[in-house]
């Protein structure tokens, strides 16, 4: 891995500092139960490894993952909840990071009032009040305004044109540099592209596979001075 990194770094215009959020997040129901969304973290780990091997300074802010992290990544911070992940990102933003890639699956809704201890079993229906969780890309907008910012947008049951439109709307609302958009129903279909890169001008580009995704993000980061 070290040899690959040295070779890759020679191709960089300048090594960039990049933060990648990845994995799933959870919200406590009580001390032993949680509401959690689904994300293996595989895309984030793959991207982190790709950027690191090309000479960039990579920090991973990881939620819960089922895909193993490359052992040679230098800095992995574990943040299993939306709140802890946001706090960590806000702290890191003080270091003047060059690029942010928001690949984590952050819960849109969290439990309003987690119970202390363990709720008793077999007590009939359990009703949970869920409240909206802060959008990380919005909360970090001011702190990261001078950085390359790339988000991920997952939708389901929408046409490709609508998917692209929603990704572009996210770029405009949150001040992103680009968004990687894909549909849930396409994720397990190998005949479908890995996703679409939508830029700040509304143009979109097909990403055939994960390698194409990694290379596209690398290019955006390395050309940041030209944007």
Where are the predicted features?
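Single conserved hydrophobic/aromatic residue that forms the stacking wall/gate
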Residues: 1-13
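Glycine-rich phosphate/diphosphate-binding loop of Rossmann-like nucleotide-binding domains
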Residues: 17-81
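Glycine/Thr-rich phosphate-binding loops of Rossmann-like dinucleotide-binding domains
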Residues: 28-30, 109-111, 189
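Short, glycine/charged-enriched secondary-structure capping and boundary segments
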Residues: 33-36, 74-75, 114-118, 164-167, ...
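Gly/Ser/Thr-rich active-site loops/lids in small-molecule metabolic enzymes
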Residues: 36-50, 119-138, 172-178, 204-220
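Short, charged/polar "capping" segments at the starts of alpha-helices
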Residues: 66-69, 159-161, 187-189
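Glycine-rich phosphate-binding loop
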Residues: 80-153, 159-183
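Glycine-rich phosphate/adenylate-binding loop
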Residues: 144-146, 163-227
């Amino acid at each position: 891995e070290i040899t690959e990194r040295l070779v890759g770094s020679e191709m960089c215009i300048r090594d960039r500092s990049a933060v990648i959020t990845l994995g799933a997040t959870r919200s406590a129901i009580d001390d032993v139960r949680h509401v959690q969304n689904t994300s293996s973290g595989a895309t984030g780990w793959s991207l982190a490894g790709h950027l690191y091997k090309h000479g960039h300074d990579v920090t991973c802010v990881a939620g819960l993952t089922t895909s193993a992290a490359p052992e040679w990544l230098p800095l992995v911070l574990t943040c299993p909840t939306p709140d802890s992940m946001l706090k960590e990102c806000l702290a890191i933003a003080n270091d003047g990071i060059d690029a942010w890639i928001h690949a984590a699956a952050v819960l849109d809704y969290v439990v309003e009032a987690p119970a202390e201890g363990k709720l008793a079993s077999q007590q009939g229906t359990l009703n949970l009040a869920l409240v909206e969780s802060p959008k990380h890309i919005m909360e970090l907008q001011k702190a990261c305004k001078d950085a390359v910012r790339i988000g991920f947008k997952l939708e389901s049951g929408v046409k490709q044109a609508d998917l692209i439109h929603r990704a572009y709307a996210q770029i405009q609302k949150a001040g992103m540099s680009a968004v990687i958009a894909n549909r849930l129903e396409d994720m397990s279909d190998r005949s479908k592209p890995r996703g679409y890169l939508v830029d700040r001008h509304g143009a979109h580009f097909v990403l055939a596979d994960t390698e194409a995704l990694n290379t596209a993000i690398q290019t955006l980061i390395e050309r940041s001075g030209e944007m």
